[in-house]
Amino acid sequence: MTGPDYPKLVAAVTVPVPIATSYFQYDQQGVVFNMWYFGWFDDAMTQFLGEVGYPYTALNADGLDVQLVHTEADWRDAVRYGEQVVIDVATERIGSTSFTLSFAVRVGEQVRSAGRTVYVVVSTDGSGKRPVPPKLRGVLEATLTEARR
């Protein structure tokens, strides 16, 4: 990804997450309808956590969850029916109670969309936000984008 709004995702700190596209996600123009990209980001986040060593189910078992508080995307080109999608995921920022992930939706080496999402850590008992736990912080720090190191 390039441009001032997104840090460059560096292969050494990204986790590629394959995403299966489905027929129902395509519109009359034969491309993935734009709302699906946000669902893909969330799906990629849960797969990303598993890949880096703290599966979403373990986070929940520890009494924690995450809530999306901000998301954004820039479209560069369409994903067309039958194309294989991979989303590169990297940690952009880690705060005291939140973290930001960057996403690059690509087909082959071509980035079709880029985005970011801010998640806040919350307690599963409904008592509110919590500090990013040490285990989660550790796996996120291992994938901080080079722009943030």
Question: Can you say where each PLM-predicted feature lies in the sequence?
Answer:
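Well-ordered beta-strand positions in beta-sheet-rich domains
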Residues: 16-18, 102, 114-118
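Hot-dog-fold acyl-thioester-processing enzymes
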Residues: 2-68, 124-149
